[in-house]
Structure formats: C-alpha cells, structure tokens
Amino acid sequence: HEDTKTTNEEYNRNLGLEYNYFSADNLWNGKLMYLKSFSPGSTDDDAIFAGNLTYNDNNFLGRVQTEYVGENYNAEVGYAPRTHYYKFDTSLRYLFFPSQDSKILSHGPLFGSNQYFNFDGVGIDRGTQLGYEVNFKNRSEMVLTFENQFIVLQNPFDPIRTGIQSLGALTEHRWNSINLAYDSKPQSLFTYALESSYGGYFQDGKRWLFFSEMGYRFQPYVELNALVSYSHIELEEPWGTNGFWLLGVKSNFTFTRNIFYSNLYQYNEQQKLWNFNSRFQWRYKPASDIFLVFNSSDTRMLTPNRNWNLTLKINFWINL
C-alpha cells in the first residue's frame, strides 16, 4: 500500500468590464467589452475584446461588430465555441413605408456579412447574406434570404456528427442556400413561427431544414411552447442520406412584475442527447437582475447525471 497526497489546483476565473453607449437622440448605440480568463499555466493571449456600433433611424439600420478571442482564452462556465481568431460583422437594412391603406407597415432589403480571420490575417470563414423583409401592420413578419457560405475547417469535422468519418482539417467548403421565415403576430394568445431553408452543405452535399415553434399564453402568468426541427442531409458515401429531429418544449412563468422562471427541455436525435435548461430571474432594480441558471445534458431522459452546471449571474445598472 502506498500513501499518496493530491492537491486540487484546477480552477477557472473570468474577470471583465463592459461599457454600453446610448446617444441622447437614440440613433446611436454601442458596446465595448473586455474579458480575461485565469487558469493554471495560462499567462498570455487569454482574453476577449469585442465591440459594436449601431445606427438606427426610421428607415436605415447599420451595424458593425468586431471581436478578438485569444488562443488561450478559457470559459469553463459559459460558452466560447472557438478561440484564436478575429471576427468582423456588418449588417445593413433599409425600410420603405407604403401608404396608410396598405396592410404592410414596412418592407426593404437587407445585407449581412460575417468574416473570421486567423492571427496571420488569413480568412478562414466567410458568410454573406442578401435578403428582403416584409413587416405587416399586425406585427407579423416574413423574411426571404439568399446565403453564401465559405468555411476552412480548423479541425477534423464529422458533417453529420455520428462518428462515421470526418472531413480533414484545412479543407475548404463552399455552398449557397435560400431561406424563408415567417413569424405570426406576437400579440395573439396563440403564436407560431415557421422557417425552411434549402441549399448546399459540406463536401458538395445538400441540406434541407425545417423549423416550427408554436406557443400559447395563459395570460398573464404562463406561456407554453413546442419546438420541432428536422434536418435532411444528403452526402456522398460513407455518410449517405440522413435525417435528424430536434424536439423541445419551453415554459415561461411570470410570478410578479419582477420575478420570472423559464425552462427548456429538448431531445437532439443527432447527438442522442436530452438537454435541460432552467433559469430563475429576479429584477431587483430597474435594468438590474440576478440570474440563477441550471444546465444539464444526458443520453437518457430524466435521469441523474454528472454533466450539469449551476451558474449565478448578477447585473447592476449604473447611470453616469
């Protein structure tokens, strides 16, 4: 028998600052954010810097956003899907307002672009979107978009995430797609949203997506929603043709003007996972909140598991 002594030196902390700007005429708003992570053995390139600036009047909206994520940035509690990149986004929209007797409130073109670069300035991901939106007077809306996607895989990637085979790192993939979305008027007790897209996919494949969300409000305390999503993917062998469902239910409870409780429970057929998210919110002062959030995921439904986290977040609004 040999006695051993162990020490737990694993930790992860994040410290940051956020500045929000709103102009007196409400035409301009922006944000600057800096976050630094602290973990054992990490001393440099472990921070995030991000900022955005938006101009919005009755007709024109323009927005630019940039972010930098260091190679060693780590957020054990939170979500940072990738590191080691620069990102630059642009959004433009112009609205026309027809005559008073029209059922359409506004309509107009929109443009969006997002670009990722590595630290050598080489483009690794690029997405471009061109579309047209229609907003009706009953507050329902419809959007038609065309998208072009370019991706350089930074790591091996399984396009259907079932473990059959992975595409190689640094391979390039391009495709186009068309997307149509409709949201019903939000003031109704019964609401719904529909979205469908068709186009290319990795490895010169094809993908068709359908999403639907239906909800009903029991005024003024409860809102229940059901979500259904289906993905149909066609690829060459060995992947072949596959279809995957994503099913979920949401519930939102309003106990008082300042206390809220929401839940999301869903099953992801592609990853064979049950996911549960529960969030309690207390607005203790205007624009100031306390959030308590529980997340878990498991391969079996309604079973205790070790893959869960509990997060406490406190926001305090200061007027300067």
Model regions and ranges:
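Exposed, low-structure sequence patches enriched in small/polar residues
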Residues: 10-12, 25-320
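Hydrophobic, small-residue-rich alpha-helical packing segments that form membrane-like cores
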Residues: 1-24
